[in-house]
Every structure is written in C-alpha cells, then in structure tokens.
Amino acid sequence: MARGVNKVILVGNVGGDPETRYMPNGNAVTNITLATSESWKDKQTGQQQERTEWHRVVFFGRLAEIAGEYLRKGSQVYVEGSLRTRKWQGQDGQDRYTTEIVVDINGNMQLLGGRPSGDDSQRAPREPMQRPQQAPQQQSRPAPQQQPAPQPAQDYDSFDDDIPF
C-alpha cells in the first residue's frame, strides 16, 4: 500500500528577523513567518485584488543555523518542507493548536534575489542552501570567505556498495 505525501513548497518573503534557539542536545531551531501573496482581477469590479497568507516555518539542524544567519526580514526565500500540527495546553487550560511548515534534513531552503534593502552585511550566498549529507564539521558557522558547504552527491549509484541490503 502506498504511503501518503506530505510536502509543502513555498516562495515568499520573510516577515521578521529569524528567531534561533538551541535545544538541550545542541541542535538549532529557527522560526520565521513567511508571507505568500496571490493576486487576481475581480470579475465584477475589474479591480486588481491581492490576498496574503502568513505561514509559520520551523527549521531544524544545520538548516536552522543557516536560516538564522542569512535570512532577514524581507528576504525572498524558497522553502520545501512538510506540514505538522502541534497541540499544547495554554495557561488557561484550553487546548491550543498550530500548523507549521517543518524544514528538517529532508527539506530544502534557497535564498532568492539579493539582500533586502538596509542590510549592509555581506553574508548572503547566492546559491541553494541544503543540509550537507555528511558528518557535521567542528565549526558551526562558516566564515564569509570560506567555500560554501558541499552539496549532497547527485550520483546515488556510487553509494550502492555501502548499503547493507
């Protein structure tokens, strides 16, 4: 029997600077809000209409560190992840729910366009940012003059010898 598919792809603008924190095990978690907009022409009035949807996006691991370092309010970004709904109890005892796009080791993030205006840093890379499929380095953040993190190998046939089944 086939499994279900839970995949979300968004292209939008970051609504505020990322919030990065670290879990007790040392893994990074970064939260952003992402605005996506669609526009259409109203058939009755002929006026151009626009609707903006806000999405909560949570990055985990190395992608969380990269998102926290490079994304800023106004950045345009491509995000690929999955939907996840969390439940917790508020201080009033009521159940609360939130649905988020989770971007983890199976996800992808790509910074689009240039740096947002007013950001005078020179840290924004121009190529896709994806979690490397190798052991983590001792250094948690690359210096701007270093080469970008290696991308996962595109030729998966070369890995056949390492698979035990």
Swiss-Prot record:
Residues 130-144 have a biased composition (Low complexity). Gene3D superfamilies: Nucleic acid-binding proteins (2.40.50.140). PROSITE patterns: SSB (PS50935). Residues 117-129 have a biased composition (Basic and acidic residues). Residues 109-165 are annotated as: Disordered. Keywords: DNA damage, DNA recombination, DNA repair, DNA replication, DNA-binding. One of its GO terms (biological process) is DNA recombination. Homotetramer. This is Single-stranded DNA-binding protein. It comes from Pseudomonas aeruginosa (strain ATCC 15692 / DSM 22644 / CIP 104116 / JCM 14847 / LMG 12228 / 1C / PRS 101 / PAO1). The gene is ssb.
